[in-house]
Amino acid sequence: MTQQAAEVAKRRTFAIISHPDAGKTTITEKLLLMGKAIAVAGTVKSRKSDRHATSDWMEMEKQRGISITTSVMQFPYREHMINLLDTPGHEDFSEDTYRTLTAVDSALMVLDGGKGVEPRTIALMDVCRLRDTPIVSFINKLDRDIRDPIELLDEIEAVLKIKAAPITWPIGCYRDFKGVYHLAGDYIIVYTPGHGHERTETKIIEKLDSAEARAHLGDEYERFIEQLELVQGACHEFNQQEFLDGQLTPVFFGTALGNFGVDHVLDAVVDWAPLPLARVANERSVAPQEEKFSGFIFKIQANMDPKHRDRIAFMRICSGKYEKGMKMRHVRTGKDVRIGDALTFFSSEREQLEEAYAGDIIGLHNHGTIQIGDTFTEGEALGFTGIPHFAPELFRRVRLKDPLKSKQLRQGLQQLAEEGATQVFFPERSNDIILGAVGVLQFDVVASRLKEEYKVECSYEPITVWSARWIECSDKKKLEEFSNKAVENLALDGGGHLTYLAPTRVNLALMEERWPDVKFRATREHH
């Protein structure tokens, strides 16, 4: 095996998906702890004392002007190199969150045991399904009251349309939480709470029918055996191929806050999740073991500190090896660039990088020339697919405070749209400008950046748009007919693509029924 193939085989690149408050930040900290990437896991404080549920070193990053370690973290674990991509949680939920999922090979879904499957989780799972991403599931918060575990598995299957195969099964919960039983291994992992940075030694009881197991479960023993028989009769068994095909998810139980069960999940990622996969480009499929370098941009992070104008473009390496100072071809512009200052996100520091391999994520300094979806190679003209725009879910009409600045406004919005900060639509029948976003915070970010960078002040007005759909139709005559009939609701997006702005869900359903030859797409590739 070449050194490069060996490096690729070590890589595991995954993202965490969850609804806000399911415990994602705590899990991220505990995962870093496993990789010894942070010596002390800062406990997440209550909302009142600390609006941002982040550990202290992330806070330092904010003061330095760019919160970048919260996006990508690389750490070693069991002789593997783990790349963990965070998907923003609360108010900073945006299209970036969806796009991050195009750069990973697997995902960890975190569910709150008391709440089950929640709306944000459903939206993120829909995106994972576009690429049949393998999903590992962690049902969190067993140190509190949770819903019936069988009910939770049923809900995963019914709502997320994926088979659920329990790997561990909880013994009690809240004050009675005694640990988990490993179904295939026939052993109990005993729960001893370990908060903060304590790595408690794991105690294992072999064999469920042992005297020690009976003593540990006490009065609960018979009831647990009955429940287990029910589970084994009703639930799916783990099948690695179905997992890799995105059809089945292995389910683990634990409590991130109590530092219990997180290592089981990380072991599953190392043992079962795929190493970096081949990526499809328009021209051909690119294997990670290929010698020549290639990668694509899936996210651009603007700096929230106006003093620093640097923006970081996040690149997923698809093949070859990055070496400091190497020359790359920026395929869209046709220009060759020398990259001497790419960033890696090892543990808690932004570091200058010497080398990186397929599966790794690196950061390029971007002075406005790089767009989402751009491909970089060692000369070959490749364009990777599967980095889409997603239909926005929130819309606002933009109003200019100074009408003489409409040119700057258009220019600013065009730039911000290319960067993925927002989507912009120009209705065919009016001079309005409509912004689309996935999270409310995106509108605030756009307004503040227009003011800082383009000296344009704007305000927003509500508008009756329920969703946007990109229009495709191979029959020119039908398309013309449709365009004439639907002109009131048609717009061009920032890239000049025809878009239907549906005022209501019912309206969209009617239009789709009425125009079977017209395709109403909820995603559009970056070109």
UniProtKB/Swiss-Prot annotation:
Gene Ontology cellular component terms for the protein in this record: cytosol
Entry keywords, A to Z: Cytoplasm, GTP-binding, Nucleotide-binding, Protein biosynthesis
Residues of the tr-type G domain: 9-277
Gene3D superfamilies: P-loop containing nucleotide triphosphate hydrolases, Peptide chain release factor 3, domain III
Lineage, top ranks: Bacteria, Pseudomonadati, Pseudomonadota, Gammaproteobacteria, Pseudomonadales
InterPro entries in the record: EF-G-like_DII, EFG_III/V, G_TR_CS, P-loop_NTPase, PrfC, RF3_C, RF3_dom_3_sf, RF3_GTP-bd
Domain of life of the organism encoding this protein: Bacteria
Gene: prfC
Pfam families: EF-G_D2, GTP_EFTU, RF3_C
Keyword flag GTP-binding: yes
Molecular function terms from GO: GTP binding; GTPase activity; guanosine tetraphosphate binding; translation release factor activity, codon nonspecific; translation release factor activity, codon specific
UniProt-recorded name of the protein: Peptide chain release factor 3
Organism of provenance: Pseudomonas fluorescens (strain ATCC BAA-477 / NRRL B-23932 / Pf-5)
